């Protein structure tokens, strides 16, 4: 879904996805899209917060309402959170707020789907080598190195590593309701 703030775009995508789900034995519904802005609690405008929540929270709810009832047993609803789903850093107010909300959505999803044969989890990547992170860091190699040095492997996480964890989470319902941190042993301050 290109524009998760557009109800029409979400509805059109759900219609296409519903037909694909119809013949599937198992589906991994992965909520990965997010907006990340540089903002703070004392300066984040309500309209800006509303836009972030529309993409990062409300769109997920809309998709879940449409698609969860169609998911066969052995399916999963996987939320891609962040290390910021359970903590906070300065300058990411709306993102942190939305990731905490996604964690609550995952936990509620776990409770609401009891006995359905479908499971959920939240995958919380650390600093991953993505366009979103590089943009947030100002495409500054020195800042990127400083961030990479904040984990025990002194590197950014590769997107393929997160993709593999998502695939694993889909095939292992034993983790239902779990928060899976994938941060290479991020240094705490």
Q: For each of these PLM feature ranges, what is it?
A:
Residues 155-182:
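C-terminal substrate-recognition "lid" of short-chain dehydrogenase/reductases
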Residues 114, 119, 174-178:
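Short, small/polar-rich loop/turn modules that mediate ligand/substrate recognition or access, typified
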Residues 115, 127-150:
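A glycine/serine/threonine-rich, flexible loop-to-helix segment
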Residues 1-8:
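Rossmann-fold cofactor-recognition segment
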Residues 40-50, 147:
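Substrate-binding pocket helix/loop in short-chain dehydrogenase/reductase
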Residues 76-101, 106-115, 127:
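Catalytic loop of short-chain dehydrogenase/reductase
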Residues 32-38, 185:
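Conserved NAD(P)H cofactor-binding loop of Rossmann-fold oxidoreductase domains
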């Amino acid at each position: 879904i290109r524009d998760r703030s557009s109800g029409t775009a979400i509805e059109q995508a759900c219609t296409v996805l519903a037909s694909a789900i119809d013949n599937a034995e198992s589906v991994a519904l992965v909520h990965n899209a997010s907006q990340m802005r540089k903002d703070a609690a004392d300066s984040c405008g309500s309209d800006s917060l509303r836009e972030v929540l529309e993409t990062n929270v409300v769109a997920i709810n809309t998709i879940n309402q449409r698609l969860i009832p169609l998911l066969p047993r052995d399916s999963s609803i996987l939320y891609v959170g962040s290390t910021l789903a359970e903590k906070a850093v300065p300058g990411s107010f709306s993102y942190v707020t939305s990731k905490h909300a996604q964690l609550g959505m995952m936990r509620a999803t776990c409770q609401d789907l009891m006995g359905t044969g479908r499971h959920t989890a939240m995958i919380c990547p650390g600093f991953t080598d993505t366009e979103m992170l590089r943009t947030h860091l100002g495409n500054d190699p020195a800042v990127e190195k400083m961030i990479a040095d904040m984990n025990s492997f002194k590197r950014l996480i590769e997107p393929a590593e997160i993709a593999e964890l998502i695939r694993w989470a889909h095939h292992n319902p034993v983790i239902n309701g779990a928060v899976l941190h994938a941060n290479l042993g991020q240094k705490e301050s």
